[in-house]
Amino acid sequence: MRALLARLLLCVLVVSDSKGSNELHQVPSNCDCLNGGTCVSNKYFSNIHWCNCPKKFGGQHCEIDKSKTCYEGNGHFYRGKASTDTMGRPCLPWNSATVLQQTYHAHRSDALQLGLGKHNYCRNPDNRRRPWCYVQVGLKLLVQECMVHDCADGKKPSSPPEELKFQCGQKTLRPRFKIIGGEFTTIENQPWFAAIYRRHRGGSVTYVCGGSLISPCWVISATHCFIDYPKKEDYIVYLGRSRLNSNTQGEMKFEVENLILHKDYSADTLAHHNDIALLKIRSKEGRCAQPSRTIQTICLPSMYNDPQFGTSCEITGFGKENSTDYLYPEQLKMTVVKLISHRECQQPHYYGSEVTTKMLCAADPQWKTDSCQGDSGGPLVCSLQGRMTLTGIVSWGRGCALKDKPGVYTRVSHFLPWIRSHTKEENGLAL
């Protein structure tokens, strides 16, 4: 009750002082005032201190720049008053009960330095691409970029951007064809990558394989990932996910409505034949995938049209770095390999006749990096006629990054009739 009375009294004093009262006194007490603000008190209540801010600043500590209408750089030091996302939805206050359960909120010890407080203004405390905020959409709490423009652009956004559309093979980051040894990456680098998990009876979920989004409702993967557990109800699919066991901003979760395994799939001692599968995905709300910066389709090649041997291509997944590793890495990883000719891959010291014309071989020329256990079903993506194209599906190989033992991939260009016959939506495919 005393605290409430003190606050009410403080409000009265502040209003009085703003109307011309000369009862304010600067005090040496530390109010953590920023931007030239001074710590003051009223002579009648000297134990109550607050920040007296310069004209263009506001907030408890003068931390809000009321004149700032754009952000510089990535907006890490933006302290303006933008408070809606790019769709015009209001941001949640950083001190709201929902936000207090997240990583960044007003009660952090470094909240003042990060610009967080008892307000809902957009900030960028973790050095993302631009200022963002938390937005409540139904029962979901989303991290959304804000409706505030870059000072370098010289203009304000007059309205929310047009609805995004799927454009196969397009990503926000440029292709990286000079990686040696692989590197950890984010989903923006491979926005078509799908992470496939299997449910267990006890309720736990484990990662199974990768896949690629070829149309809003269809993910392509490898049959050998599902052959032992072919029930569609056993699987869930995530798009837009950068980490194996934790959520990523903007990710989408899907049930598997239909699981199609190639009827002519077979496995020898080492090789997998016709190793291709299709998963029709649907969210609990009945929707297919929605395009975003982190979710995009990959282009399919034209019939029997593959890049030249020696072409550098990207592979992505949560696979192990070595076949002896016990755990999968937590962060998505990407590496670059080069396509190897069939003639070379069919040499006896490679794989001999186990490699067929429905397969492709690819490896790091130094044999330092490769697809490995856990990468199965994931994409081998090459630039073809200016578009990132799904050239192969991770299938099999001996060990990981062993000399003369390249990774072997399902040759997607040889399976287009099969893909079309089962999806029955050729116009929706990323051709």
Curated annotation (Swiss-Prot):
InterPro entries linked to this entry: EGF-like_dom, Kringle, Kringle-like, Kringle_CS, Kringle_sf, Peptidase_S1_PA, Peptidase_S1_PA_chymotrypsin, Peptidase_S1A
Superkingdom of source: Eukaryota
Residues recorded as bearing Phosphoserine in the entry: 158, 323
Signal peptide location: 1-20
Activity regulation field: Inhibited by SERPINA5. Inhibited by SERPINE1.
Peptidase S1 domain mapped to chain residues: 179-424
Subcellular location: Secreted
Free-text tissue specificity from the UniProt record: Expressed in the prostate gland and prostate cancers.
One BP term from GO: signal transduction
Keywords: Blood coagulation, Disulfide bond, EGF-like domain, Fibrinolysis, Glycoprotein, Hemostasis, Hydrolase, Kringle, Pharmaceutical, Phosphoprotein, Plasminogen activation, Protease, Secreted, Serine protease, Signal, Zymogen
Glycosylation sites: 38, 322
Region of interest (Binds urokinase plasminogen activator surface receptor), residue spans: 34-57
Catalytic reaction list: Specific cleavage of Arg-|-Val bond in plasminogen to form plasmin
Clinical note on disease: Quebec platelet disorder: An autosomal dominant bleeding disorder due to a gain-of-function defect in fibrinolysis. Although affected individuals do not exhibit systemic fibrinolysis, they show delayed onset bleeding after challenge, such as surgery. The hallmark of the disorder is markedly increased PLAU levels within platelets, which causes intraplatelet plasmin generation and secondary degradation of alpha-granule proteins.
Protein task: Specifically cleaves the zymogen plasminogen to form the active enzyme plasmin.
Record protein name field: Urokinase-type plasminogen activator
Organism placement in taxonomy: Eukaryota, Metazoa, Chordata, Craniata, Vertebrata
